[in-house]
């Protein structure tokens, strides 16, 4: 196989990774759609993608703690702690303990947290629609090749 295509693909992967990393660290402004004015100011803050994904995990799972979040989101426990601290500060989540186990803490969503989780889901649906538009630019065979590439790439990670 021609090495120039390897070089071109490597450059594309690097550019993708850089842009993706930059996007992960940027803040996400939650739109005001579907939020009453009394809740809008509270939820209008800029949230990191990590914070939003933590809210989503808590919304869809039970017995959520730092270890669970770190494992599920493939991030460090320190990153979880930092994001959780901000969510607690803004009354998006609360800490609970199980009877008989005063040491281990779990997270639950507040009413504001449930609203934020719903808004995050709406953002995911919007992103899926944008991806579908992109996918429509390619043939089925092209998409199968890209899918095979990503699945194999994951095995190398």
UniProtKB/Swiss-Prot annotation:
One MF annotation (Gene Ontology) recorded for this entry: DNA binding
Positions of the HTH marR-type domain: 6-157
UniProt keyword annotation of Electron transport present: no
Short name of any one Pfam family annotated for the protein: MarR
InterPro entries linked to this entry: HTH_MarR-typ, Metal_resp_HTH_trans_reg, WH-like_DNA-bd_sf, WH_DNA-bd_sf
DNA-binding region residue numbers: 66-89
Gene3D superfamilies documented for this protein: 6.10.140.1680, Winged helix-like DNA-binding domain superfamily/Winged helix DNA-binding domain
One cellular component (GO) term of this entry: cytoplasm
UniProt cross-references to SUPFAM superfamilies, sorted A to Z: Winged helix' DNA-binding domain (SSF46785)
Localisation per UniProt entry: Cytoplasm
Keywords: Cytoplasm, DNA-binding, Transcription, Transcription regulation
Name the record gives this protein: Uncharacterized HTH-type transcriptional regulator YvnA
Origin species: Bacillus subtilis (strain 168)
């Amino acid at each position: 196989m021609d090495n120039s295509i390897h070089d071109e693909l490597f450059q594309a992967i690097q550019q993708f990774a850089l842009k993706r990393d930059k996007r992960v660290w940027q803040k996400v402004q939650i739109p005001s759609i579907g939020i009453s004015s009394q809740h809008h100011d509270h939820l209008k803050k800029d949230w990191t993608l990590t914070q939003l994904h933590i809210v989503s995990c808590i919304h869809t799972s039970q017995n959520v703690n730092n270890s669970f979040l770190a494992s599920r989101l493939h991030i460090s426990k320190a990153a979880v702690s930092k994001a959780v601290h901000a969510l607690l500060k803004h009354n998006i989540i609360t800490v609970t303990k199980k009877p008989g186990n005063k040491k281990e803490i779990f997270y639950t969503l507040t009413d504001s947290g449930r609203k934020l989780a719903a808004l995050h889901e709406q953002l995911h649906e919007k992103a899926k629609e944008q991806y579908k538009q992109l996918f429509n630019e390619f043939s089925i065979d092209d998409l199968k090749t890209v899918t095979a590439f990503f699945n194999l790439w994951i095995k190398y990670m």
